[in-house]
Design a protein with these regions (language model features):
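Active-site- and interface-proximal helix/loop "cap" or "latch" segments in soluble metabolic
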Residues: 1-54, 63-183
């Protein structure tokens, strides 16, 4: 079912989580996204994932290449003592300003969806650090924030990539050539 959804959607984020197989679905989305990123870069090397390995101390970064609606994701995760100790996921504009500080954007989103970046972004970051502190914790344990579903799914998918990098100790910045469509 996951393979069929992926082929139809042509994107990892277009794959719906299968009821009763949440972690498997989230892993599928993560791996599919990594394969898409490799294909976009023309990289046909095998992607090795050391699933379940201890996290290596360091700072791990991921950033989107393209701006969508004036913002792109920058995500930094710190691992110390084998645990995620800090998560800094955010949407940044061309001037380096956070979407959390865009008053007009926050007001409009809150009116339409009931939440806003200055609320859901810190929630996602805090929930990730908390989830990863649990025995067998995983980015998939982060709850989707109502009203910020797309951002929550992107957060989880990107957090999984950072965890995969930390399992290997690969501190090279992950660059996502995110697809931006005109509206």
């Amino acid at each position: 079912e996951l393979n069929d959804q992926f082929l139809k959607a042509q994107s990892a984020s277009g794959v719906e989580v299968v009821t009763g197989a949440t972690h498997s679905s989230e892993s599928f989305q993560n791996y599919a996204q990594q394969l898409i990123q490799a294909a976009q870069a023309g990289n046909t090397d095998t992607i090795e994932i050391d699933n379940g390995a201890d996290l290596k101390d360091g700072t791990y970064k991921l950033e989107e290449k393209n701006y969508s609606n004036g913002y792109r994701v920058q995500f930094e995760m710190t691992v110390a003592g084998g645990k995620v100790t800090e998560s800094n996921f955010d949407y940044i504009d061309k001037d380096g300003k956070s979407k959390q500080d865009d008053t007009e954007y926050n007001e409009n989103m809150k009116a339409k969806s009931g939440t806003e970046p200055k609320t859901y972004i810190p929630t996602l970051n805090d929930e990730f650090v908390k989830a990863m502190g649990e025995e067998d914790g995983s980015p998939a344990d982060v709850e989707v924030v109502t009203g910020a579903t797309h951002s929550s799914h992107s957060f989880i998918m990107y957090a999984q990539q950072l965890v995969n990098a930390a399992e290997k100790g690969d501190t090279q910045t992950i660059e996502v050539d995110n697809i931006v469509t005109e509206k």
